[in-house]
Amino acid sequence: MHAHKTISILAIVSTLLGGALAETMTDQQRAEQILTSAGVKGGLIVHLGCGDGQLTAALRAADSYLVHGLDADAADIAEARKHIMSIGQYGGISVERWSADTLPYIDNTVNLIVCEMPDIAESEMMRVLVPNGVACIRSSDGWTKKTKPRPSRMDEWTHYLHSPNGNAVSRDELVDHLSRMQWVGGPRYGRHHDHMSSASAMVSAAGRLFYIFDHASPFSIQLPSKWQLVARDAFNGTVLWRREVGPWFSQMQRLKSGPSNLPRRLVAIDDTVYVTLAWRAPLTALNAATGETKKTYEGTNGTDEILYSDGTLFLVVNREGHSREPFTEWTRQERTIMALDADTGDISWERTWPWVIPGGMAVDHSRVVFYDGERIAALDRKTGEPLWRSEKMGRRSPVPVYFSPCLVLYDNKVLFSGSDPDTSSYHADNGKTMYALSAESGESLWRQPHAPSGYRSAEDILVINDLVWTADIFNSRDLRTDQTGTVWGRDPKTGEVKVQFKPDVDTHWFHHRCYRAKATTNYLLTSRTGIEFVDFRKEHWTCHHWVRGACLYGIMPANGLVYA
């Protein structure tokens, strides 16, 4: 789903391909030269002026490419189509007659344009190219390569909660109200509403999208799962590669939400994907362009959570193996926090702790901070030595597997909510208390009420524009409770309320969907029904009831888009 907004474009003229594409070269050689020069690895290629289709077909160097040829000459299109069908490639390669001066693609769709049609304006090519997309343009003077820059106001989403500090806020200023679809990828449905969510994790880096999904048939939840890690182009959805995942968590998990640490098992940084390819597997690094294994990290079997910061991987490892009671709650078992070099795999340090509650770890420039089920603790980032341990913090007891606390590191402060115990099981998702500590000493700075967050999911704390945002969105009047939807913005230094407002729209509210809220620097993104864009400056709610995220994971704002 694309948030419609104009993106300013500057084409960058690069080196000439020149005589390397001489007429003496075969179409296969020309295609290899173009792909090498462009540096495009997978995605949608458009050949303008495709002629007889020989070069068009050669441009599909692997299954990770889709190729579309355009030409104004009907006879050439017929010849090209005949050739492509003769080699059994029609579908992955297709051609179409086209004579207009506008291209038949929405903005930010095409990875590579090979242009041999002089009537197409360069500005039109830049419009349809994805950020960092390339146009190779042929003229009487030879070939010119031009690259569309990635807008500085666009952001990635590399971790479950955006970054290792735990603040699920994108810096993407291009994400705006939803107005159209950018692309749709299957499968169309998750497997079951009342069992394990089919979506476990999703991240995005370097113009690619990665997610873990159960592709087994929805006909019966009792059929075996087919978990896969899938890589797609983030702007057009082209499938780049797939890797099998499993054995994974049981699809028979009750009430859809699944273990809350599953989304934390996938991280993407530049051209590398860090993931566990099974429930009890070690950490593996994959080539983001091809899916090939780059490294398997020794000593990391049982990795439950992954964070990456400045070349170092920080892991929560469960070596015992038994992390939960059947389907219901997390067990209190030893966990090992580990730091290792992302390139070499060398372990810098490791420290075993009586418990590290799932979802309760974050990292900043100086320290690793986590919740051990009773107190928040900090370790030195470089050595793993303990720095401090806080006073006791309230939490749910027992801790159900769908739940995790929220811990955010911001401006030398630790913000935390662990969802205090509640005597009513129906209201057990209520947050109740939010704490702020000094990240340097662990000293308590303030505590304030914390309203219920997502239904059967983790807690919400979002820091935007130097305010700490929470909202009373867990449930609705129709479901035995009376959550008002009130939004609060607090001073991170004192906890004082600086902004407070209720929804200004009169609509049906369901319970918040079974995942936590996220945000951008312009909007809180809640899901009391579909996806609500809450403009905290204008104190205005805009509802998009036609789309929502899957249980457990939710939605992801990145690349000027919202993925759901």
Task: Set out the residue ranges of the language-model regions.
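Aromatic (tryptophan-biased) beta-strands that constitute blades/sheets of beta-rich domains
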Residues: 38, 94-95, 148, 152-201, ...
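A short acidic, Gly/Pro-enriched loop at the edge of an enzyme's catalytic core
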Residues: 101-112
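Conserved SAM-binding loop
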Residues: 80-81
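Conserved SAM-binding strand-loop segment of SAM-dependent methyltransferases
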Residues: 88-100
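Conserved alpha-helix/loop element of class I SAM-dependent methyltransferases that forms part
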Residues: 25-44, 54
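A short glycine-rich, Lys/Arg-flanked "PGG" loop and its adjoining helix->strand segment in the class I
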Residues: 120-134
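Conserved class I S-adenosyl-L-methionine
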Residues: 40-58, 64-68
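Repeat-blade elements of multi-bladed beta-propeller folds
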Residues: 194-229, 254-283, 297, 301-338, ...
